[in-house]
């Protein structure tokens, strides 16, 4: 319980105190958007590192060499824990935004930093708004910013190594932007908090990055989803 309280306090303090550097970054972004992006990324990676240290979480990464360094990609990963983003973001090269549920946009200071690192907010209950998010993601990818999506649409509370069915249109961004998909398998992230909430316990998380998949070689949407899902499960 103490670890959970510490993690929450640190996160809240960062969001509050971070208003000052956030304003400075806003000013920097007026003249140099790329510099703003790079600094924002480093700051978020730093605070995530602090949260992992306080929570006693160890992260093992495999397959980092599979991530293309010369272009944006769509990361497609399984989702079991709030710590999935905290652990994975620190490993990613280049600017990467996550697709988050629309409710996250209701938290003012959190929303600010998420937008600074190019996160998108998805309303799955509104087809029109969902399409806007997909198109925004396509623009991000075409502009060289990678996107991470959890195609299950929610945290999977099933057995370790399982995956929920992909939500419809989960791979549309990569399809329309003609960018590769990098499947990602995250193992044992729920051991940090979800498996024994409200206690945070020491855990070892493994994140495996698979080889990029060219969606153009797969003719139908279902085949594309099946291929990526199979790769994710195989890596778990």
Language-model features and meaning:
Residues 1-28, 38, 42, 59, ...:
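Membrane-interfacial terminal anchoring regions of lipid-handling membrane enzymes
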Residues 18, 22-41, 53-54, 69-127:
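Catalytic core of membrane glycerolipid acyltransferases/transacylases, capturing the structured
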Residues 49-59:
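Transmembrane alpha-helices and immediately adjacent membrane-cytoplasm interface residues
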Residues 72-74, 146-150:
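Residue-level preference for the first positions of well-ordered beta-strands
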Residues 76, 137-139, 196-200:
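Short low-complexity, flexible loop/linker segments enriched in glycine and/or proline
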Residues 79-81, 152-156:
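Short glycine-rich anion-binding loops that position phosphate/pyrophosphate groups of nucleotides
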Residues 109-112, 145-148, 157-224:
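A cross-family acyltransferase "interaction/gating" segment
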Residues 129-138:
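Anionic-ligand binding region
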């Amino acid at each position: 319980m103490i670890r959970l309280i510490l993690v929450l306090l640190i996160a809240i303090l960062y969001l509050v105190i971070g208003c000052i550097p956030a304003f400075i970054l806003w000013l920097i972004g007026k003249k140099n958007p790329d510099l703003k992006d790079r600094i924002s990324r480093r700051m978020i990676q730093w605070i995530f590192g602090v949260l992992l240290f306080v929570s006693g979480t160890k992260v093992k990464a495999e397959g980092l060499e599979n991530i293309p360094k010369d272009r944006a990609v769509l990361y497609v990963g399984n989702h079991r824990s709030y710590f999935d983003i905290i652990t994975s973001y620190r490993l990613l090269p280049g600017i990467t935004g996550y697709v988050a549920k629309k409710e996250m946009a209701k938290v003012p200071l959190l929303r600010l930093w998420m937008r600074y690192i190019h996160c998108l907010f998805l309303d799955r209950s509104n087809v029109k708004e969902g399409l806007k998010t997909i198109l925004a993601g396509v623009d991000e990818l075409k502009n060289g910013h990678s996107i991470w999506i959890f195609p299950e649409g929610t945290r999977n509370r099933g057995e370790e190594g399982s995956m929920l069915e992909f939500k419809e249109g989960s791979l549309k961004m990569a399809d329309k932007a003609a960018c590769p998909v990098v499947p990602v398998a995250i193992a044992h992230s729920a051991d940090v908090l979800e498996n024994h909430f409200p206690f945070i316990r020491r855990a070892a998380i493994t994140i495996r990055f698979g080889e990029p998949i060219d969606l153009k070689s797969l003719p139908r949407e279902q085949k594309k989803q099946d291929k990526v899902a199979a790769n994710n499960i195989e890596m778990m």
